[in-house]
Amino acid sequence: MAKEKFARNKPHVNIGTIGHVDHGKTTLTAAITAVLAVTNGAKMMDYDAIDNAPEERERGITIATSHVEYETNNRHYAHVDCPGHADYVKNMITGAAQMDGAILVVSAADGPMPQTREHILLSKQVGVPYIVVFMNKEDMVDDEELLELVEMEIRELLDMYDFPGDDTPIVAGSAKEALDEAKTGTLGPWSAKIQKLMAAVDEYIPEPTREVDRDFLMPVEDVFSISGRGTVVTGRIERGTVKIGDAIEIVGIRDTQKTTVTGIEMFRKEMDQGLAGDNCGVLVRGIGKDDVERGQVLCKPGTINPHTKFTAEIYVLSKEEGGRHTPFFTNYRPQFYVRTTDVTGAIYLPEGTEMVMPGDNVSITVELIHPIAMEKGTKFAIREGGRTVGAGVVAEILA
């Protein structure tokens, strides 16, 4: 049997379910696939298949995530669901599964809970741009006023973390009832609420800008000198495109340098342009082999700057995950592995936080000893003696 080709006839969007434990994230994921299996030929995934998520490794951290795919009339979705709270935290901080938007599941019977708040905060910190809310377990609430109260609480919570509370779509329903309905092959009133939710997701979460359409950025992995041709910088293009003749900048570690691309090669073949995802060599004019080093980036001029001080959201590996066995305190100085290199930096803890235990996630301020090209959303690993002890994402640039 020939391998099925991925048909690109619909825009592709990555989403995920977030929210407090036992509010019904996985049941909702199963219900969406079940309802869309009846209408759009999605492959139905039952609860157990989603809940027994395979483990993946990302930046040296093991994360259990379930990937489900389905289609609405307008789009193709890849949907990620994590079984445990720690998996969510790790997933969002490492960016193991990028999310263009999220479905926040809140139990109508319980209202927002601590992890509801934490997942909204994390979404803000790691740059999940849009949230749509599903108020689950509506079948367990008889009081209309209680539903309105929970909805109001959710909107206030979103506002608190700079999401547009008033404009966020909130759809009430019951994932369990919808799942039971869809399993019979006939859709009823509960399934209609799942369809309403997906219509809101279709409409409210915009199509993401493709990596190719963004500003050019390539982390430097290696530098060679080719006699008669000059200096070649190799790496994998993270985003954007680069063409022969383009003016580019070399940013990070040292003073920013300007240069022009005189050639692009991939697999020893000449190319006119390199695209996001390509591993290639870029020939640069007037730059010596010793003027560039691993850890810098090539980029479109003026699009990314070198920084040393920032705030970040980090997850610290537990002892079982191969992390530290002891807590660390303010002024801890590990290495920060950003894109292709390690840079030493000092960690400052927020006021009122005495220490950070293995397994915690925390907001910190970092000061690096060298400037590195970075922006909000840049991911990094925290290492000590060559082993990963944490992972983080830049929340805000300070200097």
UniProtKB/Swiss-Prot annotation:
Q: What is its EC number?
A: 3.6.5.3
Domain tr-type G, chain residue ranges per copy: 10-209
Compartment(s) where it occurs, according to its Swiss-Prot or TrEMBL record: Cytoplasm
Q: SUPFAM superfamilies, alphabetically? A: EF-Tu/eEF-1alpha/eIF2-gamma C-terminal domain, P-loop containing nucleoside triphosphate hydrolases, Translation proteins
- Tell me where on the tree of life, at the top rank, the source sits: Bacteria
Q: Which residues bind GTP?
A: 19-26, 81-85, 136-139
Any one of the GO CC terms:
cytosol
Where are the stretches annotated G2? Answer: 60-64
Q: How does it assemble?
A: Monomer.
Record function comment: GTP hydrolase that promotes the GTP-dependent binding of aminoacyl-tRNA to the A-site of ribosomes during protein biosynthesis.
Q: What is the protein's given name?
A: Elongation factor Tu
Q: Which organism is it from?
A: Sulfurimonas denitrificans (strain ATCC 33889 / DSM 1251) (Thiomicrospira denitrificans (strain ATCC 33889 / DSM 1251))
| Lineage start | Bacteria, Pseudomonadati, Campylobacterota, Epsilonproteobacteria, Campylobacterales
